[in-house]
Amino acid sequence: TLFPYTTLFRSAVLIKKAADESQRELDKSEIYNLFVKHWLEAKGNLSIVDLAETHLEGKENSESTSCRAVVEWKGKRYSIGKTGNGPLDAFAGALSEIPAPKFRITAFHEHSIGTGNDTSAVAYVQITCEDGNQYWGAGKSTNVGRAGVDAVVSALNQIK
């Protein structure tokens, strides 16, 4: 499926609204374009300016990834960095250094699109904020780790 089950209702509302406004059924490309606009290109308070990930080697760090990033939150730039058990965990941890809502990742789903060298990963994350509100985001990239990172940005950009 294109969406994890828990995002289907939210997506159905968006699709129904667009169909009602156009007074006709939407075709597949129009539905996909809504997905891209609302989830993959969600504009909001957070954007990535620069991102670097390093897989750490050695006995103690063999499963660790270091993330260094420059992000913009509400128009202000921050240099952030953390180490985690992978790119997604490291990036999510680094975001604790900015004044964004504190959250934890409570669901993650990923699948591939395409075959061979043209394969992309689409990642979906659900975040749960300290206030209990949950938000879904989606990211797409040829880099599996980056798809997850972009999904976190998308989820945070769902917060209004």
Task: Report each predicted region and the residues it spans.
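Terminal or standalone catalytic/regulatory effector modules within metabolic enzymes
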Residues: 2, 6-160
